[in-house]
């Protein structure tokens, strides 16, 4: 624990593991199963509960509570965990829960993520790398979030929903269906409002690739054919485009929710069993 500083008012329980150059601020409470990586900074009134692992060089702001019991009535109190990657920024009042013993029992957060004030990550979620949750964004249990996703402020994501990489959810949206990679969803209930062009440009996609994605998505959500035929047509036409293949693979994986689709005139939803 070379270079580690613990404020006199902080309570670090016996068994907690602290790395080097860790800073524990006033009135923090670190549970006996917690593992705090090198270079982490916990400001005042931070609570780390249960089997929680915090990656190196992460910064936790006041009143964040990490590793709390899952809000799952089926949870029987088994040994479950929360893993948070390195270089994460977790702002004031954020809550993240451990996994539940009804499945794998792990909640996982990737590296280089930012969680703004009062964001919430429920039990058994898997959040990728470089993900941003704006203020008051929340996701239900068992949600999967791909890399480089942005979830706007005040937005809510239904349990078991999958969000593909580089997707964007507008503020104060309610996402109840799976959102394809690069997709942009807005509204209550959220609908697919095109592609996250800004995110694709940030990711370095060329104009030709973006045009291919736009055309592929328009083909996928043209309801003139069954979904399996549309997927086959898109893959046949764009098999050399990795970005399009990512979307095809996402759809073929078939999660437990339907897909987030464009707001057609008849407002139909595309079933993942189509």
Swiss-Prot record:
Main localization of the protein described in the UniProt heading: cytoplasm
Membership in a protein family: Belongs to the transferase hexapeptide repeat family. LpxA subfamily.
Catalytically driven reaction(s): a (3R)-hydroxyacyl-[ACP] + UDP-N-acetyl-alpha-D-glucosamine = a UDP-3-O-[(3R)-3-hydroxyacyl]-N-acetyl-alpha-D-glucosamine + holo-[ACP]
Pfam families named among the record's database cross-references: Acetyltransf_11, Hexapep
HAMAP family, A to Z: LpxA (MF_00387)
A GO cellular-component term linked to this record: cytoplasm
Enzyme Commission identifier(s): 2.3.1.129
Stored PANTHER family: ACYL-[ACYL-CARRIER-PROTEIN]--UDP-N-ACETYLGLUCOSAMINE O-ACYLTRANSFERASE, ACYL-[ACYL-CARRIER-PROTEIN]--UDP-N-ACETYLGLUCOSAMINE O-ACYLTRANSFERASE, MITOCHONDRIAL-RELATED
UniProt key word Lipid metabolism: yes
GO molecular-function terms, A-Z: acyl-[acyl-carrier-protein]-UDP-N-acetylglucosamine O-acyltransferase activity
Protein name: Acyl-[acyl-carrier-protein]--UDP-N-acetylglucosamine O-acyltransferase
Record NCBIfam families: lipid_A_lpxA (TIGR01852), PRK05289.1 (NF003657)
């Amino acid at each position: 624990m070379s270079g580690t500083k613990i404020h006199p008012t902080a309570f670090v329980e016996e068994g907690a593991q602290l790395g080097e150059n860790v800073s524990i601020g006033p009135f923090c409470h670190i549970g006996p199963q917690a593992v705090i990586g090198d270079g982490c900074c916990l400001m005042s009134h931070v609570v780390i509960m249960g089997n929680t692992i915090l990656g190196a060089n992460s910064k936790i702001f006041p009143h964040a509570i990490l590793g709390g019991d899952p809000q799952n009535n089926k949870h029987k109190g088994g040994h479950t965990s929360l893993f948070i990657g390195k270089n994460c920024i977790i702002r004031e009042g954020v809550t993240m829960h451990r996994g539940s013993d009804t499945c794998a029992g792990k909640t996982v957060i990737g590296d280089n993520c930012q969680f703004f004030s009062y964001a919430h990550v429920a039990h058994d979620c898997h959040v990728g790398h470089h993900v941003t949750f704006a203020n008051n964004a929340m996701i239900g249990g068992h949600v999967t979030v791909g890399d480089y996703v942005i979830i706007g402020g005040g937005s809510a994501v239904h349990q078991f929903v999958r969000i593909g990489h580089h997707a964007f959810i507008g503020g104060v949206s309610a996402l109840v269906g799976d959102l394809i990679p690069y997709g942009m969803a807005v509204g209550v209930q959220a609908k697919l409002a095109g592609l996250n062009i800004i995110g694709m440009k940030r990711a370095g996609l060329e104009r030709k690739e973006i045009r291919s994605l736009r055309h592929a998505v328009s083909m996928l959500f043209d309801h003139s054919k069954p979904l399996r035929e549309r997927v086959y047509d898109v893959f046949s036409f764009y098999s050399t485009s990795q970005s399009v293949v990512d979307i095809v693979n996402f759809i073929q994986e078939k999660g437990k929710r339907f897909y987030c689709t464009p707001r057609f005139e008849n407002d139909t939803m595309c079933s993942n069993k189509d």
